[in-house]
């Protein structure tokens, strides 16, 4: 006897069917049941009424939709993971960009400091040369 009663929400549902167009509408007793654990209980396909061709067809469609749903959920999970990876890469690239900008500023500051120090050194060399000349003049006049 086949029951069409709803399964309680706290019990898992196991479903067996074949998507092949078989001439025999009754599923074999030894077939492996399909399980849709990723579906919420209210979305689980209800067992069909085997006496109704329309019920069997709706059941098959529901199972196909459940399989498609599972594939879409897997793809969403993969895409979310890829999104996280890309965000991490973007964060790293932005950090490297900031680091590069800081290095450019530091290089510019050091270049300016180097120019200033070279100018000061040149002025000191010039002043030292003037002092030597003055010292030599004093030594020569004494």
Curated annotation (Swiss-Prot):
Listed GO CC annotations: cytosol; nucleus
Comment, domains: Contains a C-terminal domain similar to that of the C-terminal section of MAP3K7.
Alphabetical list of PANTHER family matching this protein: MAP3K7 C-TERMINAL-LIKE PROTEIN
Gene source species: Homo sapiens
Domain of life from the UniProt record: Eukaryota
UniProt tissue specificity: Detected in lung and peripheral blood leukocytes. Expressed predominantly in peripheral blood leukocytes and ubiquitously in adult and fetal tissues. Also expressed strongly in breast carcinoma GI-101, colon adenocarcinoma GI-112, and prostatic adenocarcinoma PC3.
InterPro entries per UniProt: Map3k7cl
Name of the protein: MAP3K7 C-terminal-like protein
